[in-house]
Amino acid sequence: MRKNFGPNPLCYPQPVFILAAWGPDGIPNCMNAAWGGISNDREVSVCISAGHKTTANILSSRAFTISMATADQVIACDYVGITSGKRVPDKFARAGFHATASEFVHAPLIDELPMAMECELVSYDPVTCRLVGRIVNVSADDSILDENGKVDPARLRPITFDPMNNTYMTLGETLAKAFKVGEKLK
């Protein structure tokens, strides 16, 4: 038997993205966004409302970064989602974040979050709240790379959002090799 929840944005896992952009004053701002994902091999889409300071900064600068929220930074990542940059102009610093300018786009990288997509603005629709960015570069700190130079999710420790229970969770163990395990059924 199934339980119906009606039309709700319930999806597992939901990534926790931290979007960051420079303000016109050169001060970085960021926000937590859980409704987003890869749109195609060079684009990412995120749902953010027009009223956010970060949205205004992205529209002004035409660039942004999307960092993966991590278990190590869950408090700071939640803080930037529940605090408005319009009311707390230094919320980036209050979260304990430090910024380094991206080499690829005019946007800040968050030093404390070790993986980010560096994006140029493609479009924004204030009616649907859909922000689309072209992925110019993905950067990852050496601390989360394995011996082959690939991102190790166990070292990154990304968190996901559970919309049903309003909690953050970490990802679990490796289950099988993708595009391989299904061959057992051929």
Descriptions of predicted regions:
Residues 1-186:
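Basic, polyanion-binding surface patches
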